[in-house]
Amino acid sequence: MGRYDNLVHTFRKQYNHWGDFMPPYQAYFRGHDCLPDSSFYSSYRCYMKEAFIDKEPNFHSEEEYLCFTGYDMLDPWGTFDADIEFWIGEKLSKLEKHIINKPTIVRIPPFFWHCPLQYHRVGKPVYLQVLGTRGKFGTYVCRLDGKGGYSIEYTGLSGQKKCVMDPEKKCTVCGKCYRAREKAEDPKNATESALRYRSFDF
C-alpha cells in the first residue's frame, strides 16, 4: 500500500447493453465514488453507428463539457466522419440546434438546458468524452406528461442511483433498461423531441 493510493484510480471495464452502436464495454470515472473528494467526473464512450438515446433536455447544477473527436487518437481530425445533432439553450423555448461534423468541444454552463443529442450518420467511430466539474454528478430532466404538462425530475447522483432491473445494485448506466423503457409515443428524432419543449419558457 502506498501513501497516495487514494489519489490513483484504475479503470474497470464496464460492460454495457446499449446496442450494436457501441462497443460492449465503456469506462467511467465517477468522481467522488472513485476518488474521495474528487471535483471531477468523466465518461468515455465510442459510438460506431447511428444512435438516438439522449432524447430529453436536461441540465446540471455544475458546468459540463462534451468532447467529440474521431476515435483514432493518432488522427482525431482525419478520422472524424459523422453528423451529430445537438440542442442547447438557456431556456427550453430557446433551444438551438447545432450540427457537429468535425472535432468539437461544447461548454454547458450550470443550469443550461442541453440535448436531445442524435448521431445521424457515423461513417467512422466517434469518441465522446463527457466532463463534469463536480465529484457528485446529477441530472435534472424535463418530462412531458402527454397532456400539455411537465415535471422536472431529478434522476439522482450518478453512481448512487439504483439499478432499474435489480434494485439491489447501483446503476452503472449500462443501458440494459433502455429498450425496456422505450414507448411508442417517444420522439423518433432529436428535432421532433426539441420542438415538443418550445412552449415552455423556462
Predicted features, each with a name:
Residues 97-119:
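Conserved metal-binding segment of the jelly-roll/cupin
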Residues 135-163:
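Internal interaction segment
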Residues 1-57, 160-202:
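A short, N-terminal "cap"/entry segment at the start of jelly-roll beta-barrel domains
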